C-alpha cells in the first residue's frame, strides 16, 4: 500500500514550483523596468504622485511584464535548453509543464490588463498590452530569429515602461515621456550586443542571428561604441527641452562618459572579460540615470 504524502513532503515541492513560476517572470529585469515606470510616474506631476494609480499602475504593469517574460520562456524553451546561460530555466529543466506555463502567462497578463483597465485607465492598459505583444510575439517569436537588427527594432517594446508610468498618472501621451523612451531605446542595443559578444558561440549554435554572429565581433564593438555616443546625445535631450536641471545634466554626463569609456576599451583592447564588464556597466548606467532623473525632479526642477 502506497503511503500518503505528508505535509512536510508536499510543501517543498510546492515551494519549488512557485519559485519556478517566479523565475519565469524574470524578476530582476522587471525590477529595473519598474524603476523606470516609477520615474515616469513621478516626472509626470510636479508634486506627490496620487497613491491609487501609483500602486495599481505598478502592480498591473509588473504583472503584464511578468507575463511577457513568461511567454519569452515558452517561445524560447527549446533554444534555452541548448545554451549555457539559460539551460537551467524552469521549462528546459522540466520544473513546469508547457501547459501550466501557458496558463500562468495568460492568467498573469489578463489580470494585469484588468487591473490597469479598471483601476488606472484604458490608455495605459492598451499601451502595456501592445508592449507585451511587441516583446513576446514580434521580438521573441519573429525578430530574434529573423534579423541581426532584432534588438534595434524590438527594443521599442522594452523602452516603453517610462511612458506607461507617465500615462498611468496623466492618462495622456506626453513628449517628455517619449524622450525617456528614446533614451532606453538607444541604450538597448549596446546593452544586449555586449552580452551577445560574450555569448556569440552559443547564439551561433542555436542559429540566432545576433550581430556578432552575422557581422563579426569587431563590427559589433564599433556599433556599441557608436551607440554609446548616440546614447550620450539622447541623454542630453531632457536638458535641452527644459525638462531637467543641472543635477541631471552632471549625473548623465558622468554616466555617459563612463559608458563611452567602457565601450572604447571594448573596441580597442582585446580582453575577453570586457564585454561582460560593458554589459554590467550598462545596467548600472540605466539604473543610476533614472535615479538621477528622480533626484533632479524633486530637488531642482520642483525646488
From Swiss-Prot:
- Membrane topology field: Multi-pass membrane protein
Identify the PROSITE patterns for this entry.
UBIA
NCBIfam families on file: cyoE_ctaB (TIGR01473), PRK04375.1-2 (NF003349)
Record-listed E.C. numbers: 2.5.1.141
The Gene Ontology terms for molecular function here are: protoheme IX farnesyltransferase activity
Q: What does this protein do?
A: Converts heme B (protoheme IX) to heme O by substitution of the vinyl group on carbon 2 of heme B porphyrin ring with a hydroxyethyl farnesyl side group.
Q: What high-level taxonomic lineage is stated for the organism? A: Bacteria, Pseudomonadati, Pseudomonadota, Gammaproteobacteria, Alteromonadales
**Additional note from the record:** Carbon 2 of the heme B porphyrin ring is defined according to the Fischer nomenclature.
| Pathway the protein contributes to | Porphyrin-containing compound metabolism; heme O biosynthesis; heme O from protoheme: step 1/1
Q: Which GO terms describe its biological process?
A: heme O biosynthetic process
Going by the UniProt record, its keywords in alphabetical order are: Cell inner membrane, Cell membrane, Heme biosynthesis, Membrane, Transferase, Transmembrane, Transmembrane helix
Write one Pfam family the protein is assigned to.
UbiA
For this record, an example GO cellular component is: plasma membrane
Q: List the disulfide bonds.
A: none
EC top class named in words: transferase
- HAMAP family listed in its UniProt record: CyoE_CtaB
Q: Which family does it belong to?
A: Belongs to the UbiA prenyltransferase family. Protoheme IX farnesyltransferase subfamily.
Membrane-crossing residue ranges in chain numbering: 29-49, 51-71, 96-118, 123-143, 150-170, 177-197, 223-243, 244-264, 281-301
Q: According to its UniProt record, where is this protein located?
A: Cell inner membrane
Q: Does the keyword RNA-binding apply?
A: no
The gene from which this protein is expressed is cyoE2
Kindly provide the name given to this protein in its UniProt entry.
Protoheme IX farnesyltransferase 2
- InterPro entries found in the cross-reference section: Protohaem_IX_farnesylTrfase (IPR006369), UbiA_prenyltransferase (IPR000537), UbiA_prenylTrfase_CS (IPR030470), UbiA_sf (IPR044878)
Q: Which reaction does it catalyse?
A: heme b + (2E,6E)-farnesyl diphosphate + H2O = Fe(II)-heme o + diphosphate
Amino acid at each position: 500500500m502506497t503511503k500518503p504524502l505528508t505535509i512536510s513532503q508536499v510543501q517543498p515541492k510546492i515551494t519549488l514550483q512557485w519559485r519556478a513560476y517566479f523565475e519565469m517572470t524574470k524578476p530582476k529585469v522587471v525590477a529595473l523596468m519598474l524603476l523606470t515606470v516609477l520615474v515616469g510616474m513621478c516626472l509626470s506631476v510636479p508634486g506627490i504622485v496620487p497613491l491609487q494609480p501609483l500602486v495599481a499602475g505598478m502592480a498591473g504593469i509588473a504583472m503584464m511584464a511578468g507575463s511577457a517574460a513568461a511567454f519569452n520562456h515558452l517561445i524560447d524553451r527549446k533554444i534555452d535548453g541548448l545554451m549555457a546561460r539559460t539551460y537551467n530555466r524552469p521549462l528546459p529543466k522540466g520544473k513546469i509543464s508547457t501547459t501550466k506555463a501557458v496558463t500562468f502567462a495568460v492568467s498573469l497578463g489578463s489580470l494585469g490588463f484588468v487591473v490597469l483597465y479598471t483601476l488606472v485607465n484604458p490608455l495605459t492598459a492598451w499601451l502595456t498590452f501592445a508592449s507585451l505583444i511587441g516583446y513576446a510575439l514580434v521580438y521573441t517569436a519573429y525578430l530574434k530569429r529573423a534579423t541581426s537588427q532584432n534588438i534595434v527594432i524590438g527594443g521599442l517594446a522594452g523602452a516603453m515602461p517610462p511612458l506607461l508610468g507617465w500615462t498611468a498618472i496623466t492618462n495622456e501621451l506626453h513628449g517628455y515621456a517619449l524622450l525617456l523612451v528614446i533614451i532606453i531605446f538607444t541604450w538597448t542595443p549596446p546593452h544586449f550586443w555586449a552580452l551577445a559578444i560574450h555569448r556569440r558561440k552559443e547564439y551561433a549554435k542555436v542559429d540566432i542571428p545576433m550581430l556578432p554572429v552575422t557581422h563579426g565581433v569587431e563590427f559589433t564593438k564599433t556599433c556599441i561604441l557608436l551607440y554609446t555616443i548616440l546614447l550620450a546625445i539622447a541623454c542630453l535631450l531632457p536638458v535641452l527641452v527644459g525638462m531637467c536641471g543641472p543635477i541631471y545634466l552632471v549625473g548623465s554626463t558622468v554616466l555617459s562618459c563612463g559608458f563611452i569609456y567602457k565601450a572604447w576599451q571594448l573596441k580597442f583592447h582585446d580582453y575577453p572579460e570586457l564585454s561582460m564588464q560593458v554589459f554590467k556597466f550598462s545596467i548600472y548606467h540605466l539604473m543610476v540615470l533614472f535615479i538621477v532623473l528622480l533626484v533632479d525632479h524633486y530637488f531642482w526642477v520642483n525646488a
